[in-house]
A protein has these predicted regions:
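Ubiquitin-like/PB1-type beta-grasp interaction modules and other compact soluble beta-rich domains
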Residues: 1-79
Length: 79
């Protein structure tokens, strides 16, 4: 699973992307829990539901199931 970060999210994670090979999250909600654990500065943004998630180039809802070969992009709010 590849997770891509954009804009100021890259600054918080210090990464443009990362690969999760083992024990990948099963849905967006689990991914959010993992991100909060790994990047505490993202927690308030994740809790406020201001970030957008796309799976394989399509925006998605939190209950969407994830597969090990998915590419997930995380975007901040845009005006």
């Amino acid at each position: 699973m590849k997770i891509k970060y954009f804009a100021w999210i890259k600054d918080i994670t210090n990464k443009e992307f990362e690969i999760i090979d083992r024990n990948h999250p099963k849905n967006i909600e689990e991914l959010k829990i993992l991100l909060k654990k790994n990047y505490p500065d993202l927690e308030k943004h994740l809790d406020q539901d201001v970030l957008r998630f796309a799976i394989n180039l399509e925006y998605t809802l939190e209950n969407h199931n994830l597969n090990s070969n998915d590419e997930i992009a995380i975007f901040p709010p845009v005006s």
